[in-house]
């Protein structure tokens, strides 16, 4: 079964918006209504590649770590956290009425992300070996997590 192309993120329209605003005519990529999940992934991969080659950028999800794997300046991060922590954050964002619903939402999203990532990369989603840094978001505040990632990037850049 081919995973749904939007399984990786909630807002798959980014690629369409980017193509429309950045490239004007999207006819090079075919008619949107006729794109299969594999064709959409191919378009997405080309767009991500162009963005990565244009200069520093941050791309969340979309198998960007795999798409940009040949770039020497790539830095990939996987952020995870225990189910209870994720459920509380989902409820705090008002995306679920209670923690039980939030856990169902998180599990469904993870299942889709895992299927999508594994299918298109041949790798195992979430495996620490696929990323330069893997962090448990429940261990630090969001600000501390950001600071840690920035510190890691600065230390890495100093060695390059």
Indicate where each model-derived feature is located.
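Short gly/ser/thr-rich secondary-structure transition/capping motifs
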Residues: 38-42, 57-61, 114-119
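ATP-dependent small-molecule kinase phosphotransfer cores
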Residues: 1-56
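Short N-terminal helix-initiation segments at or just after the protein's N-terminus
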Residues: 2-3, 17-25, 72-83, 154
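ATP-dependent NMP and nucleoside kinases share a basic, alpha-helical "lid"
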Residues: 43-95
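Small-molecule kinase domains that catalyze NTP-dependent phosphoryl transfer to phosphate-bearing small molecules
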Residues: 2-24, 98-143
């Amino acid at each position: 079964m081919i995973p749904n192309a939007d399984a990786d993120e909630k807002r798959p329209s980014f690629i369409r918006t980017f193509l429309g605003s950045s490239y004007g005519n999207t006819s090079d990529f075919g008619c949107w209504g006729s794109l299969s999940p594999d064709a959409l992934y191919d378009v997405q991969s080309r767009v991500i590649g162009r963005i990565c080659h244009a200069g520093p950028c941050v791309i969340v999800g979309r198998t960007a770590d795999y798409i940009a794997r040949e770039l020497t300046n790539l830095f990939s991060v996987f952020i995870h956290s225990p189910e209870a922590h994720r459920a509380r954050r989902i409820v705090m964002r008002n995306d679920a009425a209670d923690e039980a619903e939030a856990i169902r939402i998180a599990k469904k999203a993870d299942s889709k992300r895992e299927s999508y990532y594994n299918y298109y990369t041949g790798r195992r989603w979430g495996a620490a070996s696929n990323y330069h840094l893997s962090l448990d978001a429940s261990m630090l505040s969001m600000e501390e997590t950001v600071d840690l990632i920035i510190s890691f990037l600065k230390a890495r850049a100093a060695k390059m």
